[in-house]
Amino acid sequence: HKALFQHPAGGFDDIFSYFKAFQKFQFAFVAKKELGEIPLYGKWIARIRSVFIERDDPRASLEAINRGIEYIKEGFSLAIFPEGTRSKGPDPGEFQKGALKLATKPGVPIIPVSLNGSYKMFEEPGHLTSANIEMIVHKPIPTEGLSRKEEKALPDIVEKIIVDGVRKLQANEQGVDHE
């Protein structure tokens, strides 16, 4: 199974959540370069074939994206956090539109994932606390053979699916019937 999994970034533990939820998939992750510099964690995510994006260096970012596409062609799924940074609260940040090129170029499906609760693990800087993490894995969105118009509309469609899912999880957490 090859796919691009996309969800809002809540915390450093999101990668662990993915491994638990998607044990049948071989994953590589797209992460900002700074995550690769965290002791132990950085070495671990580098070893599992993560692709590190340097936001200040467009050429290096393009090379990283091409490396991610190669990983997909080799049979890995790729998980990307479309905001490009960790959320410091319950609401997803602004999505980076270019993130979906990793799926549209090789023509693999996008699997939107809504995640709630992981941001709570790092509410206090420097302290790791337990948190209930809930996840909705949405239906795959095919990308093979999309027209330019469909490809251009894709980021907004994926963002809406993810954000609506996060809101549903938040409503459930608060005991509100969202449906």
What do these predicted ranges mean?
Residues 3-58:
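Catalytic core of membrane glycerolipid acyltransferases/transacylases, capturing the structured
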Residues 1-8, 164-169:
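Alpha-helical membrane-embedding segments
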Residues 62-179:
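Non-catalytic C-terminal accessory region of glycerolipid acyltransferases
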Residues 2-4, 50, 75-81:
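Residue-level preference for the first positions of well-ordered beta-strands
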